[in-house]
């Protein structure tokens, strides 16, 4: 696994995690 794919996958994980936190925050969870 090269550095580019590793950085891209970690970026997508952080993006999806922050998006989930925003959705949960709006729902009052």
From Swiss-Prot:
Annotated localization: Plastid, Chloroplast thylakoid membrane
Recorded GO MF terms: electron transporter, transferring electrons within cytochrome b6/f complex of photosystem II activity
Keywords carried by this UniProt record: Chloroplast, Electron transport, Membrane, Photosynthesis, Plastid, Thylakoid, Transmembrane, Transmembrane helix, Transport
Membrane topology: Single-pass membrane protein
TM region positions: 3-23
One cellular component term from this protein's GO annotations in UniProt: cytochrome b6f complex
Pfam families: PetN
Gene Ontology BP annotations: cytochrome complex assembly; photosynthesis
InterPro entries: Cytochr_b6-f_cplx_su8_sf, Cytochrome_b6-f_cplx_su8
Protein family according to the UniProt entry: Belongs to the PetN family.
Function recorded in the entry: Component of the cytochrome b6-f complex, which mediates electron transfer between photosystem II (PSII) and photosystem I (PSI), cyclic electron flow around PSI, and state transitions.
Summary of subunit composition and partner proteins: The 4 large subunits of the cytochrome b6-f complex are cytochrome b6, subunit IV (17 kDa polypeptide, PetD), cytochrome f and the Rieske protein, while the 4 small subunits are PetG, PetL, PetM and PetN. The complex functions as a dimer.
Name of the molecule in the record: Cytochrome b6-f complex subunit 8
């Amino acid at each position: 696994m090269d550095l580019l794919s590793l950085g891209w996958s970690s970026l997508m994980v952080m993006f999806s995690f922050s998006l989930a936190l925003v959705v949960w925050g709006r729902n009052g969870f």
